[in-house]
C-alpha cells in the first residue's frame, strides 16, 4: 500500500501543478480561449477531488 499511496500523492501533486499551469495560461490567453481553459481546469479540479478522496479513504485522514 505504501507504493499505492505514494503514487496517489504524486498524482495529486501533479494535478495541482496542472491546475496552476492552466491558471497561468488563462492569464495570458486571448479572451476567446479562456472559456475552454476554464472547462479543462474544472475537469482537473474534479480529478483533484477524486484523488484526494482515494487518499483519504486509504489513510483514514482528510486530505488538505
Which residues fall in each region the model found?
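Non-heme di-metal
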Residues: 1-64
Amino acid at each position: 500500500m505504501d507504493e499505492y499511496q505514494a503514487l496517489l500523492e504524486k498524482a495529486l501533486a501533479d494535478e495541482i501543478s496542472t491546475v496552476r499551469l492552466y491558471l497561468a495560461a488563462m492569464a495570458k490567453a486571448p479572451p476567446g480561449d479562456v472559456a475552454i481553459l476554464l472547462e479543462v481546469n474544472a475537469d482537473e479540479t474534479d480529478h483533484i477531488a477524486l484523488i484526494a478522496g482515494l487518499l483519504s479513504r486509504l489513510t483514514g485522514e482528510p486530505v488538505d
